[in-house]
Design a protein with these regions (language model features):
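Conserved N-terminal subdomain of the carbohydrate kinase-like
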Residues: 1-117, 121, 268-281
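Glycine/charged-rich beta-loop-alpha catalytic/anionic-binding loops adjacent to active sites
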Residues: 2-7, 200-211
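Glycine-rich beta-alpha junction loops
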Residues: 11, 38-40, 84, 114-116, ...
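Conserved active-site and cofactor/substrate-binding residues in soluble primary-metabolism enzymes
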Residues: 16-20, 27, 54-61, 87, ...
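Conserved phosphate/ATP/ADP-binding segment of small-molecule kinases
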Residues: 123-203, 213, 233-237
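Short glycine/threonine-rich catalytic loop with a Thr-x-Gly-x-Asp
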Residues: 208-226
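Short glycine/serine- and small hydrophobic-enriched flexible loop segments
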Residues: 224-232, 245, 249
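Charged C-terminal helix
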Residues: 237-284
Length: 284
């Protein structure tokens, strides 16, 4: 059974961070050990929230407790998302190092959350530097959106060629696999959005309809599903197709519900067995 140590935020109401990643992974049959970096009432997109931000030493202590059970050797991947500060980033890197010492075959999957093309960069100014210089070089898999890819590599991905060049620059930094979770190239068909996966054996693109929806947590679900499918199959193209199909079904159901939060529980069957099967195109 695949086991993932997921170090992310958590909310009581809604689905972001671990509250978005854990259930879909479990629905796929993955054992998930969540370590929370915050436990808020709701995500910060509402403009107001309550609850504690975990101190770095508290997060480290939870990982240490897992290590003391002799369990880190069972971990196949460490998954991280939004990092609220530099110290949390260092705790994540320490957890990765300890996990890989216990299981050299384990991978580190990093969702380098920084912002998007609409909102710009919305994290502390130190975070992009931390990600670029310390975190991404230690990752085996990263899942940026197109904006974050450009920020990390100090490039300007636009069309397919420039986006592939930016991915190559990211892979030169350390990760062997890059999933670009939202590619908005100017020459794509109208009302569509794409994902691009690049692995050591090629590059693949998948296109889905672009729904008129802004859903907090969708990137967290995407990173989790792709990590799980890649661990299971070892095939980036298969992982890409499965992930895009499940995420589209989730977003479609969320859009149809008229609700702001992801309809994760309501979409559980589509997460495991997506209704839509989108074709994956080899682009290199």
């Amino acid at each position: 059974m695949t086991t993932i140590l997921s170090i992310q935020s958590s909310v009581a109401y809604g689905h972001v961070g671990n509250s978005a990643a854990v259930f879909p992974l479990q629905r796929l049959g993955v054992e998930v050990w969540p370590v929370h970096t915050v436990h808020f009432s709701n995500h910060t997109g509402y403009g107001a929230w309550r609850g504690p931000l975990m101190a770095p030493e508290e997060v480290r202590d939870v990982v240490t407790g897992v290590e003391e059970r002799g369990a880190l050797g069972e971990v196949d991947a460490v998954l991280s998302g939004y990092q609220g500060g530099e110290q949390i980033g260092e705790v994540v890197l320490d957890a990765v190092a300890r996990t890989k010492a216990a299981n050299p075959d384990a991978i580190y999957a990093c969702d380098p959350v920084m912002g998007n093309a609409t909102s710009g960069c919305f994290v502390h100014p130190a975070i992009p530097v931390l990600l670029r210089e310390r975190v991404v070089p230690r990752a085996d898999l990263i899942t940026p959106n197109q904006f974050e890819l450009g920020f990390l590599t100090e490039t300007e991905p636009g069309d397919l060629g420039s986006t592939l060049a930016s991915v190559d620059a990211a892979r030169d930094m350390g990760p062997s696999t890059v999933l670009v979770t939202s590619v908005l190239r100017p020459d794509r068909p109208k009302d569509t959005i794409e994902m691009l996966a690049v692995h050591h054996d090629g590059a693949w693109l998948v296109r889905t309809p672009h729904l008129p929806l802004t859903a907090n947590g969708s990137g967290d679900v995407t990173a989790a599903l792709f990590t799980a499918h890649l661990l299971e199959t070892g095939d980036a193209a298969v992982a890409l197709g499965r992930t895009a199909s499940s995420v589209f079904d989730l977003l479609r159901r969320t859009h149809e519900s008229g609700r702001r939060e992801l309809q994760l529980v309501q979409s559980q069957e589509e997460i495991a067995n997506p209704r839509m099967q989108f074709a994956v195109e080899r682009v290199r």
